[in-house]
Amino acid sequence: MCFTSQENLMKGLDESGLKVSLVNKDNPNLHKNAPWQHIEVSSSTTPGLKSSSLGRSMNRWLASHENYSNCVAIIDWRLIKYLHATLSNKSIPWILLDRSPPADKGLLAKLQWPVWKKSWRLVSKTSHSRGSVVSPSHGKFVQDFVSISDEKIFTLPAGVDLEKFTPNKKTGEINLIYHGRLDRHRGVLALPMLVSKARAKGIEVRLTLIGEGDCANQLRLIADSDESIAVYSQMPQDQLATHLQKATIGLLPMPNWNIWSISSPLKRGEYCASGLLIYGIDHDGHRFTDNKKGWMKLVPQHDFHDEAIKWFSSLAEDEIQKYSQQSRKYAEDNLSWQLSVDGLLSAIHELKS
């Protein structure tokens, strides 16, 4: 789980009156002033061994402590196989946290798929357990691979910090932004080409890219020769929020592949909370439940550039401001982390009842 999701869910659980303990490999200084208890355990830094090393360290810690019997464990899918026996022996109910099946390409992802399936089979066969998914389509995806009842699965969507991510007044300028992994398989290399094609049609746009990934250096080289493109390394949330405030349109270029079509991207909510219009590829992972929104335009992948140029050229300044307000309002009504926390609390109380 990314730190943003972890922090907001734990904060919500703490504010609800529950005692929260976090067991992971983080440096204790990261949680020095946090309201939850943090327990650091060791983990290997060798690729391919990180999860097994961390899982075994967590299991040793759990096996040696007796004062955690009256609790519910929330565990990432990569780790549950190392902890399942000890949790069962101690009669500790647990929730599987699945924020995404294996998302990387290559050998590592191939090795992770059997682990992911086994994790969900453990949910299916263990009486005092539930599994969380980020979207209904994610839940259906799980059921395509594992025989598991609807009652064992609940949706825990990504939320957004509405106080950290806030809008600024928009102008008529078209400032595009994408933040997240700058990986080739996420479609980000199509974004500089969008700037070039828009410019060829007489539309001035600027593009900001924030993150790291396997094509980050290639994107930086492109930006070096195009002053309308800026590439930044991954940054703290406060700095990210400032960049989002300056933008007009948030981009969702991830293609219509299984891994993206079942997702609930954090950036989508952060775009909305910042009052951005949204443009991206049309699939379930990018859509909201009600997809008919003037401030959000999703198109087939093969039309990504042409439809963007048509939309950008049609946007007047007053329309951008109106859509910005509607986008923020949607975030306030539908995307607060509290909604996710409430869903998690409900699952916890059901397991303890």
Where is each model-derived feature located?
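Nucleotide-activated donor-binding/catalytic signature segment of Leloir-type glycosyltransferases, i.e.
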Residues: N217-A241
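Conserved donor-binding/catalytic core segment of Leloir-type glycosyltransferases
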Residues: S132, K169-V195, T208
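Carbohydrate-associated surface elements
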Residues: S137, G159
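A charged, aromatic-enriched C-terminal amphipathic alpha-helix characteristic of glycosyltransferases
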Residues: D303, A316-H349
